């Protein structure tokens, strides 16, 4: 598995699977939930859950006789919002009211942990824009971020505006292991690359 996770963006897990069934069909699997269970040094498993958004056959597994290899990609339910283009008007609603109206029809779990109250927007327009970009734009304007939590069988979107709502990770220290100086890899979570980068940004906001 190769995966990426971000704050205020979509996670993506590219997964290689094996099965004795040589005739698994994408139409039966795409859109279905998938959960990965990862052993950790703490002894308790870590779960990663998503929805299968693409599925393909690779071929016979070279290492396991009578097994066939498949590949799939797992993404959060919020990925569905990237697949539409919509135009609509929201009247007398706050950013959280709008988010609730956009997300609720999908029927997937999300929770709001925002600590601030937000202004009522008299008139807010989504015009020829997918709903993911629309919500991201509103969240960025208001200083709201989001992330996903994973459990065995599901994942949940969490919307927040305060770091005080974040849960501490089980271990406060993550070791650094450079592949350039030490061969092999430890059987624990670790950082292998740390990069510092400067960028040109605007310094003023004028209205």
For the regions a protein language model found, what residue spans apply to each?
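Amphipathic alpha-helical and helix-coil boundary elements used as assembly
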Residues: 1-207
